[in-house]
Every structure is written in structure tokens, then in C-alpha cells.
């Protein structure tokens, strides 16, 4: 399975820029530019990753159109901004149900990619603890279409606050 990591492309571009400027590394200012360039190459590009998560959700939605999956999933339809990480973790757990219920390798691969992308973004934000949020099992059960719509909504909340 190939995991798409578009943020690595920006790192290679920054490395090429460093090579173009290599003649200036002999000065103190050039060394500072080089060090700052290396730091910026490692910074997460969360907005781009969330866009890729939405893209994977759309792909899953397209793939399940041709199947009949009669599953209900725990869905947070009214996410409070202070509980968005907890809600995202519930959505990621429920995605595994879609993967299992479908039995389709394309859906499975897309779900795995989406989970990896989302977990990488969440881990780059540090361990955020939220209190007063609903547990996954306390959420309302909804069909897959409503689940995916709510999932896109919460991802957009992450994009708007990054």
C-alpha cells in the first residue's frame, strides 16, 4: 500500500533552494538562512494534510455508492469546538467499521491512508486533553452518508482553526 505524503514534496523543494544558495553558506547570515530553512522543512503543513483527508473522504463516498452497506455509525453531528479532537478520534474509529463492512480493498486502503494522515496531524498538535466531551458510544447512530457529511464538517473545523 502506498501512503501519499504530499508534504514531503515541499521538503525536497526547500532542499533544492538550499543547494542553489550553497555559495552563501560561507557567511554567518548564510548559515542562519540554512538552519532556518532546515527547521521550516520539518514544520507540519496541516492545512494541506486536512485537504487530503477531505479528498480521501470524498473517495470513500464515491466508492460506497456502488455498494449497499447497511451500517449505522456513531456520529457527532453538532461538534463543540472544545471537543473536536475527541470527536475526530471517534470518527477515525468508526471509519474502521466502514472498512470492515465493505470488504473492499480500495476502501480499506483509502481508510488506512486517511487514518494515518489524520493521526499524524493530531499527533503534531501534541496530546490535547478535552474534558466534558461525549464518549463515542454516547453519540447518535446515523447512516454512512450522514456520517461522512459530519466527518467533512469536523475536518473543515480543523482547517478553519489552523
Curated annotation (Swiss-Prot):
Any one GO cellular component localisation term in the record: extracellular space
Matching Gene3D superfamilies: Interleukin-15/Interleukin-21 (1.20.1250.70)
Superkingdom of origin: Eukaryota
Residues bearing carbohydrate: 127
Signal peptide stretch: 1-29
GO biological process entries: immune response; interleukin-15-mediated signaling pathway; neutrophil activation; positive regulation of cytokine production; positive regulation of immune response; positive regulation of peptidyl-tyrosine phosphorylation; positive regulation of phagocytosis; positive regulation of T cell proliferation
Keywords assigned: Cytokine, Disulfide bond, Glycoprotein, Secreted, Signal
Propeptide: 30-48
Subcellular location field: Secreted
Example of a GO MF term: cytokine activity
Disulfide bond entries: 83-133, 90-136
Protein family membership: Belongs to the IL-15/IL-21 family.
Function: Cytokine that plays a major role in the development of inflammatory and protective immune responses to microbial invaders and parasites by modulating immune cells of both the innate and adaptive immune systems. Stimulates the proliferation of natural killer cells, T-cells and B-cells and promotes the secretion of several cytokines. In monocytes, induces the production of IL8 and monocyte chemotactic protein 1/CCL2, two chemokines that attract neutrophils and monocytes respectively to sites of infection.
PANTHER family: INTERLEUKIN-15 (PTHR14356:SF3), INTERLEUKIN-15-RELATED (PTHR14356)
Record-given protein name: Interleukin-15
Source species: Chlorocebus aethiops
Amino acid at each position: 500500500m502506498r501512503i501519499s505524503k504530499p508534504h514531503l514534496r515541499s521538503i525536497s523543494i526547500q532542499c533544492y533552494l538550499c543547494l542553489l544558495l550553497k555559495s552563501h553558506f560561507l557567511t554567518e547570515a548564510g548559515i542562519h538562512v540554512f538552519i532556518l530553512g532546515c527547521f521550516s522543512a520539518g514544520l507540519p503543513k496541516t492545512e494541506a494534510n486536512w485537504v487530503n483527508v477531505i479528498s480521501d473522504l470524498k473517495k470513500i463516498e464515491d466508492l460506497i455508492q456502488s455498494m449497499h452497506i447497511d451500517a449505522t455509525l456513531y456520529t457527532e453531528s453538532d461538534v463543540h469546538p472544545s471537543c473536536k479532537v475527541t470527536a475526530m478520534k471517534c470518527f477515525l474509529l468508526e471509519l474502521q467499521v466502514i472498512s470492515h463492512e465493505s470488504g473492499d480493498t480500495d476502501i480499506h486502503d483509502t481508510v488506512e491512508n486517511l487514518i494515518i494522515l489524520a493521526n499524524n496531524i493530531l499527533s503534531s498538535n501534541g496530546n490535547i486533553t478535552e474534558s466534558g466531551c461525549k464518549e463515542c458510544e454516547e453519540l447518535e447512530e446515523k447512516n454512512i452518508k450522514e456520517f461522512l457529511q459530519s466527518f467533512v464538517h469536523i475536518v473543515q473545523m480543523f482547517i478553519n482553526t489552523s
